[in-house]
Amino acid sequence: MSVLVKEVIEKLRLDIVYGEPELLEKEINTADITRPGLEMTGYFDYYTPERIQLLGMKEWSYLISMPSNSRYEVLKKMFLPETPAVIVARGLVVPEEMLKAARECKIAILTSRAATSRLSGKLSSYLDSRLAERTSVHGVLMDIYGMGVLIQGDSGIGKSETGLELVKRGHRLVADDRVDIFAKDEITLWGEPAEILKHLIEIRGVGIIDVMSLYGASAVKDSSQVQLAVYLENYDTHKTFDRLGNNAEELEVSGVAIPRIRIPVKTGRNISVVIEAAAMNYRAKEMGFDATRLFDERLTSLIARNEVQNA
């Protein structure tokens, strides 16, 4: 995957100091950013020209302190064909030598009024999410009470119908049928729809529904963190399902594990309400309120009292 320079400009609201249209179509293939330091002294061993070059106050001050001809020579060595763009932070004035080198080497020069550290963080986060490797899973991703819940199950079990019912109950659809999931960092999963399926949901017997057109912009979301997985399966009298919520199960995607619960589907059960309760219960556990632990404590206390009375 790659990101175009013009997409970064639009996302971070950067100003274009120099950049022909074809330069804004350059591809960025790495989320790493370089803040050139030793390179300005002429040391180019281990230089990474394929990264976006970000100049803050320190780099700019050192550059300005150099004689004009030395400044131009250093910048010409820094600006290579594979360099996607150069960004100058804090709204600092771009030296004429930089513009001259950029024109000769065909490198876009961009500026931002944001502080260097803040700009670097936003840029890294954006590139990380855009360039992360995607894993496609079958299911429905919903935003329920601000939590990303991935609904999975066998084909025909009613995942999309459950998603539609949740939309009617005020929750938001992120993706139906195919969910593209990526690891935003070592502990966080993020999910989004395939572009062709965005805001659409397929219901057997009805066809494809445009959720945004029918229910409005508040019924959809472009992406969401994936925090909980729910697996729907047919009710089986010969199978034992978790009744206390103490059998921990996990779903692992891209090396990141999230909790997963299994919900048996049976005629008469309102699955959307059950999933709502599961989402709220998970949030309560994250806040330190565990109903299973509370029940266990009460049961232990009751047994202890009975033993004392019967002694």
Swiss-Prot record:
GO MF entries = ATP binding; magnesium ion binding; phosphorelay sensor kinase activity; protein serine/threonine kinase activity; protein serine/threonine/tyrosine kinase activity
Q: How does it assemble?
A: Homohexamer.
The UniProt entry, under Gene3D superfamilies, shows:
HprK N-terminal domain-like, P-loop containing nucleotide triphosphate hydrolases
Binding residues for ATP? G153, D154, S155, G156, I157, G158, K159, S160
What else is noted?
Answer: Both phosphorylation and phosphorolysis are carried out by the same active site and suggest a common mechanism for both reactions.
Which top EC class applies here?
Answer: transferase
The record's domain comment reads: The Walker A ATP-binding motif also binds Pi and PPi.
* Active site: residue positions: H138, K159, D177 (proton acceptor), R243
Q: Which residues does the record give as Mg(2+) binding sites?
A: S160, E202
An example GO BP is: regulation of carbohydrate metabolic process
Enumerate the residue ranges of region (Important for the catalytic mechanism of dephosphorylation): 264-269
Q: Does the keyword ATP-binding apply?
A: yes
Q: Which reaction is this enzyme known to catalyze?
A: [HPr protein]-L-serine + ATP = [HPr protein]-O-phospho-L-serine + ADP + H(+); [HPr protein]-O-phospho-L-serine + phosphate + H(+) = [HPr protein]-L-serine + diphosphate
| Similarity remark | Belongs to the HPrK/P family.
Q: By its UniProt entry, which NCBIfam families does this protein fall under?
A: hpr-ser
Q: Which InterPro entries match?
A: HPr(Ser)_kin/Pase, Hpr_kin/Pase_C, Hpr_kin/Pase_Hpr_N, P-loop_NTPase, Ser_kin/Pase_Hpr-like_N_sf
Q: Which Pfam families match?
A: Hpr_kinase_C (PF07475), Hpr_kinase_N (PF02603)
Q: Membrane-crossing residues?
A: none
Q: What does this protein do?
A: Catalyzes the ATP- as well as the pyrophosphate-dependent phosphorylation of a specific serine residue in HPr, a phosphocarrier protein of the phosphoenolpyruvate-dependent sugar phosphotransferase system (PTS). HprK/P also catalyzes the pyrophosphate-producing, inorganic phosphate-dependent dephosphorylation (phosphorolysis) of seryl-phosphorylated HPr (P-Ser-HPr).
Please give the name of this protein.
Answer: HPr kinase/phosphorylase
Cofactor(s), names only, from the UniProt record = Mg(2+)
User: Per the record, which residues fall in region Important for the catalytic mechanism of both phosphorylation and dephosphorylation?
Assistant: 201-210
Enzyme Commission number, as recorded: 2.7.11.-, 2.7.4.-
- Keywords attached to this entry: ATP-binding, Carbohydrate metabolism, Kinase, Magnesium, Metal-binding, Multifunctional enzyme, Nucleotide-binding, Serine/threonine-protein kinase, Transferase
